[in-house]
A protein has these predicted regions:
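The serine-hydrolase catalytic nucleophile loop
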Residues: 115-128, 141
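Conserved alpha/beta-hydrolase
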Residues: 129-148
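Alpha/beta-hydrolase active-site loop
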Residues: 151-172
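Hydrolase active-site cap/lid region
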Residues: 195-248, 255
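Conserved alpha/beta-hydrolase "acid-adjacent" motif
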Residues: 272-278, 299
Length: 317
C-alpha cells in the first residue's frame, strides 16, 4: 500500500496541473463572437441594424510595435463616402477591425467589449450612447471577434487601443476630438478602459470621462466566478491560473486613482461574474449604481435606473 501513496500524489498533481492549464488556456483563447454569433443571438449584425444609427464606416488598424506609427485601413461600404487609404498589412500583422459610428452628441467615444465578446456585442450598448458623442469607435480586441492573435485578457489591450483611436479619429469627419474622449468598457473592457484612461492622463491628455460597466478589480474575480457559475471547482486552481497569467497586474481601483476624469460604474444585482460587491470594490470611491434584476451580459443594455444614471452622468460631465 505504501507505494500507492506517492503514486496517488503524482496523479493528484497531474490532475491539478492539467486543470489549471485548461483554465488558463480557456482564458487566453475564448470562443469568438462573430457575425454568426450575432445572428444566433438575434442581435444586430451591423451598426445599420441599431436604432438611431444614421451613418457608419468600417475600418481597421494595423498594429505596430511601440515607436512606430500605426497604419489604418478604411473600408468604404455603400453607405460611406470616405476614401480608402493605408499601407497593406504584412503576413505577421495584427489587424484590429472596428466600426466608426456617427452619433448626435459632441466629442469622441470608445466602446470596448468584454472577454469572449466582440464589437457585435458592443452594438447592444450603442443605443444608450448615441446622443452623447459625435463619433463612437467600436473595435474588436486582439483575440476576439475577427481580430487575430490571442487575448492579453485586458493587460495590454489599452496599448492597442491607443493606436486605434489615433487612426479612427483621422477617419472621422465630425471633428470629434474637439469635445474630448469618453471611454466606455464592459467587464474586461472596463479594465482596459481604466488602463487606457490612466495612460492618457500620464501623457497629459486625460479622457473626458470614463464609464465602467460590470468592472472587476483583478483577473481572479471573473475567473473564479465563471467556474462557480458552471459548477466547477475553484479551489487554488483559479488563483494559480490568474497568478500565471497576470503576475504584475495592478488592481483596477489603483489604476483609477490616476485617470484624472469623472468615473461612473454600473453593475447588476443578478451578476454572478462580477457581483455587486466586486463592482463596488473595483470602482471605489467613484459613483456606482447597482440595478437589481440585471445580469452580467445585460449591464449597460437593460435597466431603467442604469440608463437614467448613465444619461445624467454623460450630460453633466
Amino acid at each position: 500500500m505504501i507505494p500507492l501513496i506517492p503514486l496517488a500524489a503524482v496523479a493528484a498533481g497531474a490532475i491539478t496541473t492539467t486543470y489549471t492549464v485548461a483554465i488558463a488556456r480557456e482564458a487566453k483563447r475564448p470562443r469568438r463572437a462573430t457575425y454568426a454569433w450575432a445572428l444566433a443571438h438575434h442581435s444586430a449584425a451591423s451598426p445599420a441594424e441599431v436604432p438611431g444609427v444614421r451613418t457608419w464606416h468600417e475600418g481597421s488598424t494595423v498594429l505596430h510595435t511601440m515607436g512606430h506609427t500605426p497604419a489604418a485601413h478604411h473600408t468604404p461600404a455603400a453607405h460611406s463616402t470616405s476614401p480608402a487609404h493605408a499601407t497593406p498589412p504584412s503576413a505577421r500583422s495584427i489587424v484590429l477591425p472596428w466600426w466608426l459610428v456617427e452619433g448626435q452628441g459632441a466629442g469622441a467615444m470608445l466602446l470596448i467589449h468584454g472577454w469572449g465578446r466582440s464589437r457585435w456585442d458592443s452594438l447592444r450598448r450603442l443605443p444608450w450612447l448615441l446622443e452623447h458623442a459625435a463619433s463612437i469607435v467600436v473595435p474588436d480586441l486582439r483575440g476576439h471577434g475577427e481580430a487575430p492573435g490571442t487575448t492579453s485578457i485586458g493587460h495590454s489591450d489599452h496599448l492597442d487601443l491607443d493606436q486605434v483611436i489615433q487612426r479612427a479619429d483621422n477617419a472621422s469627419a465630425s471633428g470629434a476630438t474637439n469635445g474630448g474622449l469618453t471611454i466606455v468598457g464592459h467587464s474586461m473592457g472596463a479594465m482596459v478602459a481604466a488602463r487606457l484612461a490612466a495612460l492618457l492622463a500620464a501623457r497629459g491628455t486625460p479622457a473626458r470621462r470614463l464609464v465602467l460597466m460590470a468592472p472587476y478589480d483583478s483577473l481572479i474575480v471573473p475567473m473564479a466566478n465563471r467556474l462557480r457559475v458552471r459548477g466547477l471547482p475553484t479551489g487554488p486552481f483559479a488563483a494559480s491560473a490568474a497568478w500565471w497569467l497576470a503576475r504584475d497586474e495592478e488592481p483596477v481601483h489603483r489604476t483609477l486613482a490616476r485617470v484624472q476624469c469623472p468615473v461612473l460604474a454600473l453593475g447588476g444585482g443578478l451578476d454572478a461574474v462580477t457581483t455587486p460587491d466586486d463592482v463596488r470594490r473595483a470602482a471605489a470611491p467613484h459613483e456606482t449604481l447597482i440595478e437589481p434584476g440585471i445580469d452580467h451580459a445585460n449591464v449597460g443594455v437593460e435597466g431603467t435606473a442604469s440608463r437614467e444614471a448613465l444619461h445624467a452622468f454623460l450630460s453633466r460631465t
